[in-house]
Amino acid sequence: MGSDYDSFDDDVADEVLMALDKPATSGLHSREQEQQRDISNATPHTSTDLELEDFGSDAFDYSPERERAKPIQTARNQARTFQQTTLLGRIASQAPEPLGTQPRNSRVFRADLPPEVPTHHALDPEALKTWVYPTNLGPIRDYQFSIVKNGLFNNTLVALPTGLGKTFIAATVILNFFRWTRNAQMVFVAPTKPLASQQVEACLNIAGIPRSQSTLLTGETKPVLREAEWEGKRLFFMTPQTLMNDLSKGYADPKRIVLLVVDEAHRATGDYAYVKVIEFIRRFSKSFRVLALTATPGSTVEGVQDVIDNLGVSHVEIRTEESIDIRNYVHSREIDRVVLEPSDEMLRISELFSQALKPLHSKISQQKIYIGRDPMSITTFGLLKARQDWMKGPGRFANQGLKMMLMAIFTILQSLAHAIKLLNYHGIRPFYDNLVAFRSETEDKGQKGSKYKRQLIGEQSFQEMMDLASKWLKIDGFAGHPKLTHLCDNLLNYFMDAGEGSSTRVIVFSEYRDSAEEITRVLNVHKPMISASLFVGQADSKKSEGMKQKQQIETIAKFRDGIFNVLVATSIGEEGLDIGQVDLIICYDASSSPIRMLQRMGRTGRKRAGKITLLLMKGKEEDNYAKAQDNYEKMQKLICEGSRFNFRHDLSSRIVPRDVKPEVDKRMVEIPIENTQDTSLPEPKARSTRGKKASKKKFNMPDGVETGFNSVASMLGISASKTKAKPNKSPKKAESKETDEISPVPPLEGVLLSVKELAELNKKYRDLPFFHQDTEEICMPSLTARPDLQRVLRPTVHVKHGSYTKRCVRLFKKLSHSQGIETRHTKPHGDTDKSRYLDISVPPFAEDSGEDVVVVPSGRKRSLSPSSAASPPPPGRKRKANTTAAPRSKRQSVVDEYASESEDDTAAARQRKTNAAASPESKRQSVLDEYASESDAEAVTQASEDEESVGSLADFISDGEANGNFPKDMTGFTSDEDDDYRSGSLAKSSLSGPLSGRQVHRSSGAASKSGSTASTAAKPFFVPASLPGTQQTDDDEDMPDIGILVGKKQPETRVRKPAKKSNAVFLSSDDDDDDNDDEDDVQPGPAKRTVRRRVIEDSESG
């Protein structure tokens, strides 16, 4: 390479050098004298050129040059006879160069490079004095030593044939950067987890890096575990996709990465994860080393250049099998090419399938879209290319119907081209399975499917072909392809020659999974001599599931241990897998890619001589293999020459200071004890971060970046004085700080409402009328409600919580913690009510024979006279109210009683309607609900008005009450204001209805037995209810005598009719049998009247 630069001076004319040394003259006269002198001294060749010196430099740009003596043309000059032009017609050498980032292909010297920015990594000055080369594996190999030395100081692309120790080179470079830096991190990335797992053993057991400082991360590892590993470990083995995710989420710090080892670097093209990782790290740091490992850099010059640009490679170390320094370490590989002819069965199937495809193939041939006579020669790529060319050309102006028809035919033929490839290169069974799936899909759609698909499967030749294939595949021992027959014979002979107990192993490579499954099935027929296992990728197919990474690792381990001796693998086994002592490689199908072919061949000949057998079909497959071999040899020469590639010296930093020159230290590296005790993979354990969660996403910023806002003036360097003065804004008012002192208590006159305001409040807001009949009361808000919310600070808008509020909240919260867990949220400490008062059984009704009813004080039940005691109903059953009906009209009575909480609150009434009997001949029934409150609130009762029967009230009056004698237990129902109204209100009241004359009074002492009237009126205990006008009547015939009501007279006996159902609301009863009481006969006399009365418990919980 240096000879090209040294010979540059020979191409420069001596006249040009002499002209550069002469000083420039001024003036026309001096110029003419100089020209005459030059002409007289010039040679015939140069005199003509000097005469044209006055013309412009571009006067003869497009004129032919003067013919000179033709020099002897060399191979280099002959290559310059062709000129490359641009799209505008200019010569490529004269066209302006694009603004690219690649430097010119020139020799780079250290002195010509700009001064390098010191690295931001913390280095160990003592360790930088030496670099270690391990001698654990035996003698030193020169090519490995040279590659490691260059890889320490340059971004290097290492291209070595398989089995020559690329992993050892990577482990040595990792070891030295591990020593040189204090807390920097090294990452080894591989395309798959099995490949990454293999590198762990080499780095830990060869380089001696502590196991506690290394880890293996994949996509299966939880993010919280990966984050913890990035914080404490220094060496990472992972897939590029996982590394990209950790970088983007902020788990990994790109500034800490000092070394990135890329395995199978030929994948670093396009949008692969390798490219994204390098770009991401380079955004934040340029001080990191890249070591790229591969066996085949690429198949084209452009592909290799993409790898160099994407990885920032500045140096290439490439070796071939013919290189002198590796010739002693390459084992011989015997390549055996077997060319086979198609079988008679294949030819018959091809003939029938060609007849079936002929109608569809002729339609695209007539349009001159796809030229070809034989339908069996179609390929997927050829059809796709022809379709694109037609759409860009004649297809743009074609009829829409024609275009849609041709596109449908193209789609069908492209799907069938894969089946043709399976038939030609893999066998009849994969071909038959593919067409069975095609036919089933078409038949399932029925008439909704493509008509061209139905036309194809309806062809007689297609049906005959499928019948023949199905019949042949049912025959035992039918191979279906000559490759299968030759494969079985070759393996049987190979294992028989190896002898029993041999440890030899074989790998069979196939491109498609269907073909690999068929090969495995056929080989396992010859057990126990041949024991085959399938090795495929993780993706699922239509017929079978993929292999997880764990299953892949287990399969490789079993193959190494000799549990089975044949491994049938797809492309997943081509790259990088160190499967072990493989002595025979069989390529079931040849690939046109030289990368894939070399990767396959590299699986053998690693530690001893190997053999490679290629099974090729005569024709196209044989030609593809020849092209792959030629392309590989050509690319190896170009890479070794290096003149066609531009290397990125600008992206390769030395990291180690230039004044530091480490010396090599060849020694035996000590392996830590922890590396030998535990042989498992260093994967993070789930128990180490139990209960932790992944942190939020972090955003890494480059060094020196300003995260704040910069004005345009500051970016242009304009001082603040030159900028326009900003208008003065009014200063913001200082926010009042919170004080610990409580504000003084205001006087009550300024806070409480006046008498007038209180009356207005009661009138407008507290007492809301309901149809101008009843009064509904709105209670004031309670400060003790919602105790759970008083233990937490509620959201605020304008006013923040004060210090005393916070102290109170903490106090309430601390008090709640002092309660038990079960009672913390129940009343009175919470809002939950667990008293279960609804589950209390309803008290039994008592039979009233007209005698006195004794009211039991609070906490006791109301007692009955011995003659009227009734047995309690069974618990758990609801009691329904007895209903009777009058002969003429329905009788309704609603009685509700409420007690208010304070003495100042006025009483309001709510109606509860029940049906009651109105006939004087029937027994009297009514229901009274009594509620007791904590304060001395007044109780209000309502009775019916005009058409309500007086009999419903008679049930509440005993003989003693009728004579003015109230029981002593009734004294609690009177107030001090009712002392003047303890007797004789019946004579004074004016009756406007049947019941308005009857009043039930409260008594604080013994009631008077006389019926005398009082001079003053008091507030009644029962308030008459206002009934709608539709139920009013002037008929008072049903009005019974007062004597009958109090039991002094006997009413006339009448026959009762069954009561009709009413829409009134009744209190339910626990005894369903009480409904039959409506049919009881009426018995004269108060002593024989039996009416069920409810015994009310006079307590707060009732």
From Swiss-Prot:
List the InterPro entries hit by this protein, alphabetically: FANCM/Mph1-like_ID, FANCM_DEXDc, Helicase/UvrB_N, Helicase_ATP-bd, Helicase_C-like, P-loop_NTPase
- Cellular-component GO terms for this entry: nucleus
Sequence ranges of Basic residues compositional bias: 687-699
Gene3D superfamilies for this protein: hef helicase domain, P-loop containing nucleotide triphosphate hydrolases
User: Carries keyword ATP-binding?
Assistant: yes
Principal location class:
nucleus
The record's annotation in SUPFAM superfamilies points to: P-loop containing nucleoside triphosphate hydrolases (SSF52540)
Which residues fall in a compositionally biased region of kind Acidic residues? 1069-1082
| Stated role | ATP-dependent DNA helicase involved in DNA damage repair by homologous recombination and in genome maintenance. Capable of unwinding D-loops. Plays a role in limiting crossover recombinants during mitotic DNA double-strand break (DSB) repair. Component of a FANCM-MHF complex which promotes gene conversion at blocked replication forks, probably by reversal of the stalled fork.
Name of this chain's protein: ATP-dependent DNA helicase MPH1
Organism of derivation: Pyricularia oryzae (strain 70-15 / ATCC MYA-4617 / FGSC 8958) (Rice blast fungus)
State the gene name recorded for this protein. MPH1
